[in-house]
Amino acid sequence: MIIPAIDLIDGQVVRLYQGDYAQQTTFNLSPLDQLKSYQQQGASLLHIVDLTGAKEPDRRQTALISELVNNLDTPIQVGGGIRTEAQLSELLEIGVSRVVIGSLAVKEPELVKSWFTKYGSDAICLALDVNINEQGEKIVAVSGWQSGGGKSLESLVEEFKSVGLKHALVTDISRDGTLKGANTELYYEIATLYPEIQWQASGGIATLDDVNAVKQSGATGIIIGKALLINQFTVEEAIACWPNA
């Protein structure tokens, strides 16, 4: 499944290199027009990251996200610095289909597990941003990648399986925004270990060959941001390569 994505800072479409706010590219595009184009080309899920909200929770772009949701028919998944239940429920109330929770799942697992129980496992996607160390361990980073988390991907997945974890988005930080290709070995490994989870691959996608490689890896979806913005290929071409299930 192809999941086109946009990152937003102060209402503008941007891309960061490896999650670094100092290495930002701004695109002169209307977020709504861009997402409408992805929708018209056949996307069955869209992904939005509120980078302003991730950095400064009191400046979350909820009004803009609400406007986008109201003007699109495609289900939308939203992430970016969700720290409280109020923020989660607000996004669900304005019509967001699924909320992406990252750092908090590492820092306060019991709290996030209670949300799975309350809102259901379809309403939440865990974002696991990993640094792979020299020993090959997949260490989940927290706080917008600015600090290490110290928990392994496997230990977190085991913990959240108890509350029915169904959707997880995994990014190899070393690939994000680089157009260097996806870490297909990573996706193959986790999809083999946990076939019951819908794995979304993210980071590094540059070509349709990359899309094909991720499709073969066992991931169920692929998030594509920068490659679409710089016209490496279109959503339509990507879907032709990997039709929506």
UniProtKB/Swiss-Prot annotation:
Highest taxon above the source species: Bacteria
InterPro entries documented for this protein: Aldolase_TIM, His_biosynth, HisA_bact_arch, Isoase_HisA-like, Isoase_HisA-like_bact, RibuloseP-bd_barrel
Pathway noted in the entry: Amino-acid biosynthesis; L-histidine biosynthesis; L-histidine from 5-phospho-alpha-D-ribose 1-diphosphate: step 4/9
Reaction catalyzed: 1-(5-phospho-beta-D-ribosyl)-5-[(5-phospho-beta-D-ribosylamino)methylideneamino]imidazole-4-carboxamide = 5-[(5-phospho-1-deoxy-D-ribulos-1-ylimino)methylamino]-1-(5-phospho-beta-D-ribosyl)imidazole-4-carboxamide
Gene Ontology BP, a term: L-tryptophan biosynthetic process
Pfam families referenced in this protein's UniProt entry, alphabetically: His_biosynth (PF00977)
An annotated Gene Ontology molecular function: 1-(5-phosphoribosyl)-5-[(5-phosphoribosylamino)methylideneamino]imidazole-4-carboxamide isomerase activity
Entry EC number(s): 5.3.1.16
Enzyme active site: 7 (proton acceptor), 129 (proton donor)
SUPFAM superfamilies, per the entry: Ribulose-phoshate binding barrel
UniProt entry keywords in alphabetical sequence: Amino-acid biosynthesis, Cytoplasm, Histidine biosynthesis, Isomerase
Subcellular location: Cytoplasm
GO cellular component term of the entry, any: cytoplasm
PANTHER family: 1-(5-PHOSPHORIBOSYL)-5-[(5-PHOSPHORIBOSYLAMINO)METHYLIDENEAMINO] IMIDAZOLE-4-CARBOXAMIDE ISOMERASE
Family: Belongs to the HisA/HisF family.
HAMAP family given in the database record: HisA
Protein name from the UniProt record: 1-(5-phosphoribosyl)-5-[(5-phosphoribosylamino)methylideneamino] imidazole-4-carboxamide isomerase
Organism listed in the record: Shewanella pealeana (strain ATCC 700345 / ANG-SQ1)
